[in-house]
Amino acid sequence: LASSAASDVYKRQKEEVAYQDGQIVSKTLAQNDAVSVTLFSFAKGEEISTHASGGDAFVTCLDGVGEVTIDGEKFQLTEGQSIVMPAGHPHAVYGKEQFKMLLVVVF
């Protein structure tokens, strides 16, 4: 039962942000001084350029194929895979294909 409930939440998250040609779409689920939780959808070829964050960022791929670059090293993410982008380290996110992700930043 717990697995089924988790699966339902995961499916609903994927449906919260639609793909739009040539765009990155985001939806903030929660934000305060300690944490930020945001859903993103990337059209193929769209990118959030290199920047650094003041908090540790945890990314989970919800759909598609994305590429995360951290300190110049590239990592490919597919559905269900996650990665941590450490605070203060330069990173970028790119939609190799259409790509949806959940971003949790802890400050």
Where are these regions (language model features)?
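Single conserved hydrophobic/aromatic residue that forms the stacking wall/gate
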Residues: L1-A6, Y10
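A short glycine-rich, His/Asp/Glu-containing loop-to-beta-strand
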Residues: E15-E46, V104-F107
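Short, conserved beta-strand element in jelly-roll/cupin
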Residues: S41, G54-V68
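A cytosolic small-molecule/anion-sensing beta-strand core signal
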Residues: L62-D63, T78-E79, E97
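Short acidic-glycine-tyrosine-enriched beta hairpin
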Residues: G72-A87
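Ligand-binding loop in jelly-roll beta-barrel domains
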Residues: A87-F107
